[in-house]
Regions:
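Formylglycine-dependent sulfatase
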Residues: 5-9, 20-443
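Intrinsic-disorder-associated, low-complexity terminal segments enriched in Asp/Asn/His/Tyr and depleted
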Residues: 1-3, 12, 16
Length: 445
């Protein structure tokens, strides 16, 4: 916007014969902004990646992208729950400022996001797939939406599919937190079908020509439960996966708030009764989860190849980002899913690759999901949205000493006995402190 105004003022000061020269000069002096592709998954445990050192989970495409980019190995969500974490990422504000703590929260339409900032400097901001928006506004700064969501009907060609996808229709409750281990194994699922449609839409879009610089966000629902992987990938992990050492954690290891999150039973499909979750169930869930991650990695490889072709075809520079809204403990500490400040739930993968990003670099300083938007604005000279709680990660690319003492916050509103207990986590250096209000137990360090 500012560039446009400056150009307009300059043109008004020139004679007709000079206008063409001024326009050419202005356009040639303005640095080209990189196109951006941001793959944003749902519920990917940050430590279940090859590039993070996991010995079993295979993620060759992400590993290759990470080796040619910068990895933030201590990145965290602002809230270990979908809508609050995603709202924080888009707005750059903590849940205590967005006032969104549950999956029913709605971002006000007059709330600025980093997409608005990118749009103001000429970007076409495109949403392909999941963002878990609630309410009538399904854009929040996106100028185009080429694929709808699976849990909320939005714009795009496949937004209505959720009504026809079996387990996400009449059996929706069975794949929520309470029933996440009721369905697991190898096969097909609404998650796999939805993500396939998301990737098809992304590949189709990247096969087209676009005049404006692009910021494309590809949102997948995988590897969110139900824990169902393609059969071949489930078999690959089924006999190799182990039960986490922390599965049987008891006593002082748990804060009272996390003790209540332990998954002790599942529903017997034949009788409908609650039965104890066995170690075999844990292995099955983890084998499927690992298979879903590898499946997602394959899809990322496909879209990355199309992205590289798009950049080459249009002679443009590109920036690639991968992250997730939160993690999944998947049996660690006896818990499945999110809702806690354990590393498996609160930590997120965060990788930058491409224009302006160092290769083969790992940053150990803590980073937050609320830093992503500010970083993209910084890398593209876009104005930052107002009232930001985060900070650009760009200084971390150059080993700025001021970044060594970074700290990040994560917030969660725990529901307990018909009351809410707000909790906070702070990570600085190698320490993490967790505390809940209205708790009968002190914080954990």
């Amino acid at each position: 916007y500012r560039d446009t105004v400056c150009a307009f003022c300059a043109l008004n000061r020139k004679t007709d014969s000079e206008i063409g020269k001024e326009t050419v000069l202005f356009m040639s002096e303005r640095p080209a902004r990189p196109d951006m592709l941001f793959v944003f998954s749902d519920q990917h445990n940050a430590h279940y990646c090859g590039f993070d050192g996991h010995e079993l989970v295979e993620t060759p495409n992400l590993d290759r992208i990470a080796s040619r980019g910068t990895v933030f190995e201590s990145a965290y969500t602002a809230c270990p729950l979908c809508v609050p974490g995603r709202s924080a990422m888009l707005t750059g504000q903590l849940p205590s400022h967005t006032e969104i703590y549950t999956n029913s929260g709605i971002i006000p339409s007059d709330q600025a996001t980093f997409l608005h900032s990118l749009g103001s400097v000429g970007y076409e901001t495109v949403l392909c797939g999941r963002m878990h928006f609630k309410g009538p506004d399904q854009r929040h700064g996106f100028t185009r939406r080429i694929m709808g969501d699976i849990t909320v009907v939005g714009g795009g060609r496949f937004g209505e599919w959720r009504k026809e996808l079996g387990v996400y229709g009449e059996h929706n409750l069975r794949v929520g937190m309470a029933g996440c281990v009721d369905i697991m194994g190898g096969g097909n699922s609404p998650v796999l079908e939805y993500d396939r449609a998301v990737m098809e839409a992304a590949l189709e879009y990247l096969g087209q020509h676009h005049e404006k610089p692009q910021c494309i966000v590809v949102g997948t629902y995988g590897p969110h439960f139900p824990y169902v992987a393609p059969p071949e990938l489930y078999r690959r992990y089924r006999d190799r996966v182990e039960v986490p050492v922390s599965w049987a954690d008891e006593g002082d290891v748990h804060h009272p708030m996390t003790e209540e999150k332990k998954q002790r039973t599942r529903t017997d499909p034949e009788t409908g009764d609650g039965v104890p979750v066995s170690e075999e169930d844990v292995r099955a869930a983890r084998a499927a989860y690992f298979g879903m991650i590898t499946h997602l990695d394959r899809q990322i490889g496909e879209v990355r190849e199309a992205w590289d072709s798009y950049l080459e075809r249009n002679d443009r520079e590109g920036l690639f980002i991968y992250s997730s809204d939160h993690g999944d403990t998947c049996g660690e500490h006896g818990i499945f899913g999110k809702h806690t400040f354990f590393e498996g739930s609160a930590a997120i993968p965060l990788v930058f690759n491409g224009a302006g990003v160092p290769e083969n670099k790992t940053v150990s300083s803590p980073a937050s999901i609320i830093d992503i938007g500010l970083t993209l604005c910084d890398l593209t000279d876009a104005p930052p949205p107002p009232a930001q709680d985060g900070a650009s990660l760009r200084p971390c690319f150059s080993d700025d000493d001021s970044q060594k003492n970074r700290h990040v916050l994560s917030e969660w509103m725990h529901s307990r006995e018909d009351a809410f207990a707000p909790g906070r986590m702070i990570r600085r250096g190698r320490w993490k402190y967790v505390s809940f209000a209205h708790s009968d137990c002190s914080g954990l360090l």
